[in-house]
């Protein structure tokens, strides 16, 4: 195998060729960074209603999200190396087709974790302690599909752990609004990863892999809808808390109406249970992440300069 072939295999292992997963982790991480900065500003005293994070914090958490997502993909392929070859969508992955070995996947995981850990040098020491949970969750998630029908919950916790880390980095502690944001993110992630699992459900049943799509059965779309409603309600409450003291009031909350329409379109597609339709619904969630980030970012910038 040539150097270019090996490099391409590593790129596929870490999914740098498929940025959808990066965005699904990146945008919510930045939601946390922005809200934590708002909270810190509001804690400073009367008359201060908004604030923005420092550029360094913003960059560190963005890079951390990208690197830890890649690490998660590497350990996921290591865990699934014996089953990916039996699933039509994953049989071309580099461990499944033999282009990379299990040792090379573990090495890639460790290198990416170490690179992520190096970013902690730019953050308060408390964040270092919180990072242990992030690594543990990222490592154990891929193995959960063998033992429980709720691997999507572990994925959501692993991906969402950057939110409390952002609050600890900026505010010094994870407050109730941090955990509500984390819960909202958990609901959204379990919903979209169930859509993803619906695309593989037939193959997963054959090879004995567990998922929420299998657990929910014919109630899958209903439960996804309920999770999405919970996301909207909790996110609306978080936005209410941060923006009501500002000149925008509850205006940003109304912006979630577009997200509700996005969710409705996704569920309409998933109702057919067609694998491609479910996968396309999953992919559509990058626009949810982008839009909610834009909504929060614009509101934070506006209120920082206009009160």
From Swiss-Prot:
Q: Is Transferase among the key words of this record? A: yes
Its recorded reaction(s) are:
all-trans-octaprenyl diphosphate + 4-hydroxybenzoate = 4-hydroxy-3-(all-trans-octaprenyl)benzoate + diphosphate
Pathway participation: Cofactor biosynthesis; ubiquinone biosynthesis
Is this entry keyworded Methyltransferase?
Answer: no
What's a Gene Ontology MF term here?
4-hydroxybenzoate polyprenyltransferase activity
For this protein, the Enzyme Commission number is: 2.5.1.39
Cofactor(s) listed in the protein's UniProt record: Mg(2+)
Bilayer topology term: Multi-pass membrane protein
One GO BP on record is: ubiquinone biosynthetic process
Location (main, coarse)? membrane
The membrane spanning regions, by residue number, are: 19-39, 48-68, 105-125, 127-147, 150-170, 172-192, 221-241, 243-263, 282-302
Q: Where in the cell is it found?
A: Cell inner membrane
- Keywords, ordered alphabetically: Cell inner membrane, Cell membrane, Magnesium, Membrane, Transferase, Transmembrane, Transmembrane helix, Ubiquinone biosynthesis
A UniProt-annotated Pfam family: UbiA
Q: Which GO terms describe its cellular component?
A: plasma membrane
Q: Which NCBIfam families match?
A: ubiA_proteo (TIGR01474)
The similarity annotation says: Belongs to the UbiA prenyltransferase family.
Q: What does this protein do?
A: Catalyzes the prenylation of para-hydroxybenzoate (PHB) with an all-trans polyprenyl group. Mediates the second step in the final reaction sequence of ubiquinone-8 (UQ-8) biosynthesis, which is the condensation of the polyisoprenoid side chain with PHB, generating the first membrane-bound Q intermediate 3-octaprenyl-4-hydroxybenzoate.
What is the name listed in the Swiss-Prot or TrEMBL entry for this protein? 4-hydroxybenzoate octaprenyltransferase
Q: What is the scientific name of the source organism?
A: Psychrobacter arcticus (strain DSM 17307 / VKM B-2377 / 273-4)
Q: Tell me the gene name.
A: ubiA
